UniProtKB/Swiss-Prot annotation:
Catalytic activity annotation: 2-[(2R,5Z)-2-carboxy-4-methylthiazol-5(2H)-ylidene]ethyl phosphate + 4-amino-2-methyl-5-(diphosphooxymethyl)pyrimidine + 2 H(+) = thiamine phosphate + CO2 + diphosphate; 2-(2-carboxy-4-methylthiazol-5-yl)ethyl phosphate + 4-amino-2-methyl-5-(diphosphooxymethyl)pyrimidine + 2 H(+) = thiamine phosphate + CO2 + diphosphate; 4-methyl-5-(2-phosphooxyethyl)-thiazole + 4-amino-2-methyl-5-(diphosphooxymethyl)pyrimidine + H(+) = thiamine phosphate + diphosphate
GO cellular component term, pick one: cytoplasm
GO-annotated molecular function: magnesium ion binding; thiamine-phosphate diphosphorylase activity
Protein task: Condenses 4-methyl-5-(beta-hydroxyethyl)thiazole monophosphate (THZ-P) and 2-methyl-4-amino-5-hydroxymethyl pyrimidine pyrophosphate (HMP-PP) to form thiamine monophosphate (TMP).
NCBIfam families documented for this protein: thiE
Chain positions recorded as 4-amino-2-methyl-5-(diphosphooxymethyl)pyrimidine binding sites: 45-49, 77, 116, 146
Pathway(s) this gene product operates in, as recorded in its UniProt entry: Cofactor biosynthesis; thiamine diphosphate biosynthesis; thiamine phosphate from 4-amino-2-methyl-5-diphosphomethylpyrimidine and 4-methyl-5-(2-phosphoethyl)-thiazole: step 1/1
Positions annotated to bind Mg(2+): 78, 97
Cofactor binding note: Binds 1 Mg(2+) ion per subunit.
Protein name: Thiamine-phosphate synthase
Protein's organism: Nitrosomonas europaea (strain ATCC 19718 / CIP 103999 / KCTC 2705 / NBRC 14298)
Enzyme class: transferase
SUPFAM superfamilies according to UniProt: Thiamin phosphate synthase
């Protein structure tokens, strides 16, 4: 378990929400995460679809230590057992994962639960009713990390903000050229992976994304 540190940021999901890339080299991954955190990431999701359970545990635990240093909440993608083992700040679940209500029973009231809602506003409404703390829509643009996903119209963000009382995250193919349009349409946060961790200067890229919310 990660040792206690300074209190985490308060409030709902907002700003730059970084999602880690699939990377087997833990040292390189942690270095990239450190740069992103130094650049102003507000929330970080650990996601590695290619790692086995042992590597995920090692990587998530080390990344959690980094997040604690920067007082940034760590959300674990999909794996409830991993989120519980490292005492992560939250869990993100997709369409084929456990329900937010079940996740809440296991994690307790103080953890953050996010739900992928693709292009489905009804699913987002149900997620909020089931106790989700935020919902994510997308992909809004072609994405290297979210292949074969639903295409979401930008207008969905405006509609969601009118219907929901929880933060809305946009995801899928987001870069510095299109993030501003999504933010202007009402999303509280943009979830970014390739445009951040694939940048030559990760820290600067994180700063540029963060400044879009100023």
């Amino acid at each position: 378990m990660v040792p206690a540190a300074e209190p985490m940021k308060q409030g709902g999901v907002s700003g730059l929400y970084a999602i880690t890339p699939d990377m087997a080299d833990t040292g390189r991954l942690c270095d990239a995460v450190r740069q992103a955190l130094a650049g102003g990431v507000s929330w970080l999701q650990y996601r590695n679809k290619t790692a086995d359970s042992r590597l995920r545990l090692v990587q998530a635990a080390e990344i959690h230590l980094l997040c604690r240093q920067f007082q940034v909440p760590l959300i674990v993608n999909d794996h409830l057992d991993l989120a519980m083992e490292i005492d992560a700040e939250g869990l993100h679940v997709g369409g084929d994962d456990i329900s937010p209500a079940v996740a809440r029973c296991h994690l307790g009231q103080d953890k953050i639960i996010g739900v992928s809602c693709y292009n489905q506003l009804d699913r987002a409404i149900e997620a909020e009713e089931a106790g989700a703390d935020y919902v994510a829509f997308g992909a809004f643009y072609p994405s290297m990390t979210k292949t074969g996903t639903y295409q979401a119209p930008i207008e969905l963000l405006t509609a969601a903000k009118k219907k929901l009382g929880i933060p809305v995250v946009a995801i899928g193919g987001i870069d510095l050229d299109n993030a501003g349009m999504l933010i202007a349409s009402g999303c509280d946060a943009v979830a970014v992976s390739q445009a951040l961790f694939g940048a030559q200067d990760i820290q600067s890229a994180a700063r540029y994304f963060s400044e879009l919310f100023d």
